[in-house]
């Protein structure tokens, strides 16, 4: 294992040195406003430079936190994005109703592209209001638990469902199961109310529980407010419906100040990729022997089988 750790450290340190050279060059040239920071690492290095200047010390670019954050970005950023896209394609293949509704929605919100027989541009995809697309992406993250768990450290002695947890304990939270993809476990509300902080209680009220009747189903409409329901004629643009990311519990990216800071990039990537795939292709059902719902768990959850049968679609009315 020592060899692998050394290789890992050598790789990370090389990337840190590259970012350091970019940022120190930025200062010496006096063109900080014109040079674009290329990555999260550039921002980490810039923040360390600013913190060192305020403290009157030399920057320390090689200290542990920067290395640890960079490793987390490399592992989690790559695996979570590929996992999310794999599950999105799998869910849309399995659920023809959602796939058809989403394609109709994309044609409606990108009406000019549809009339002109062309693919929407990235600028159009990332800026257009598309509540049903956002709901589908959110439902993928809820159901797929691309990141199987998240960690927090207890800052004081506490209790979790009757179990004593001493200060300093690392607590592992599952991002699936009860409350997320299965009915919630009933707890003693009186005891829970006394042990929770006012902010925690307020958050619990702000994000309601899912209905136990359909919590296990892949149903993107749960993220829309008000519920779109049937309309005649159908409003595929969902003009009078809003996407609500707090419609119910979902922990794919953690929360609070230690939540995933790459969350917006993942959503942006999913918006682009899902739109482009459904714009050009029908996702046809695969044989049962190639359609297992089982997953492989690691730093992210990936489907064991993710096969596609594609048919090209026509553009324009």
UniProtKB/Swiss-Prot annotation:
Keyword presence, Metal-binding: yes
Cofactor(s) listed in the protein's UniProt record: heme
Top-level taxon in the UniProt lineage: Eukaryota
Annotated keywords: Iron, Metal-binding
Pfam family of the protein (one): p450
Binding site for heme: 260
Region (Disordered): 183-205
InterPro entries found in the cross-reference section: Cyt_P450, Cyt_P450_E_grp-IV, Cyt_P450_sf, Cytochrome_P450_monoxygenase
Molecular function in Gene Ontology: heme binding; iron ion binding; monooxygenase activity; oxidoreductase activity, acting on paired donors, with incorporation or reduction of molecular oxygen
Biological pathway: Secondary metabolite biosynthesis
Main function: Cytochrome P450 monooxygenase; part of the hps1-dma1 gene cluster that probably mediates the biosynthesis a derivative of cyclopiazonic acid (CPA). The hybrid polyketide synthase-nonribosomal peptide synthetase (PKS-NRPS) nps1 might incorporates acetyl-CoA, malonyl-CoA, and tryptophan (Trp) and utilizes a C-terminal redox-incompetent reductase domain to make and release the tryptophan tetramic acid, cyclo-acetoacetyl-L-tryptophan (c-AATrp), as the first intermediate in the pathway.
Protein family (similarity comment): Belongs to the cytochrome P450 family.
Official protein name in the record: Hps1-dma1 cluster cytochrome P450 monooxygenase cyp3.1
Organism the protein comes from: Dothistroma septosporum (strain NZE10 / CBS 128990) (Red band needle blight fungus)
Gene: cyp3.1
């Amino acid at each position: 294992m020592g060899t692998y750790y050394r290789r890992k450290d050598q790789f990370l340190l090389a990337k840190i040195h590259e970012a350091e050279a970019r940022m120190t060059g930025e200062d010496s040239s006096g063109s900080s406003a014109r040079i674009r920071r290329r990555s999260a690492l550039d921002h980490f290095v810039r923040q360390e430079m600013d913190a060192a200047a305020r403290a009157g010390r030399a920057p320390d670019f090689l200290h542990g936190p920067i290395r640890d954050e960079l490793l987390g970005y490399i592992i989690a950023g790559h695996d979570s994005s590929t996992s999310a896209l794999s599950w999105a394609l799998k869910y849309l293949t399995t659920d023809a109703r959602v796939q058809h509704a989403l394609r109709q929605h994309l044609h409606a919100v990108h009406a000019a592209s549809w009339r002109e027989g062309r693919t929407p541009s990235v600028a159009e995809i990332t800026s257009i209001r598309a509540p049903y697309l956002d709901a589908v992406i959110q439902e993928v993250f809820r159901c797929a638990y691309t990141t199987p768990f998240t960690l927090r450290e207890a800052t004081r002695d506490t209790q979790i469902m009757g179990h004593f947890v001493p200060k300093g304990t690392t607590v592992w939270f599952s991002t699936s199961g009860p409350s997320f993809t299965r009915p919630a476990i009933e707890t003693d509300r009186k005891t829970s109310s006394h042990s929770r902080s006012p902010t925690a209680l307020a958050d619990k009220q702000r994000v309601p529980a899912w209905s136990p009747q359909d919590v296990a189903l892949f149903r993107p409409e749960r993220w829309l407010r008000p519920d779109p329901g049937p309309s005649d004629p159908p409003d595929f643009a969902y003009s009078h419906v809003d996407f609500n990311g707090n419609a119910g519990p979902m922990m794919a990216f953690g929360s609070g100040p230690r939540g995933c800071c790459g969350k917006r990039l993942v959503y942006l990537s999913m918006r682009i990729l899902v739109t482009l795939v459904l714009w050009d292709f029908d996702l046809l059902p695969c044989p049962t022997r190639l359609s297992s719902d089982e997953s492989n768990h690691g730093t992210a959850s990936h489907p064991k089988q993710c096969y596609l049968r594609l048919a090209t679609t026509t553009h324009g009315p």
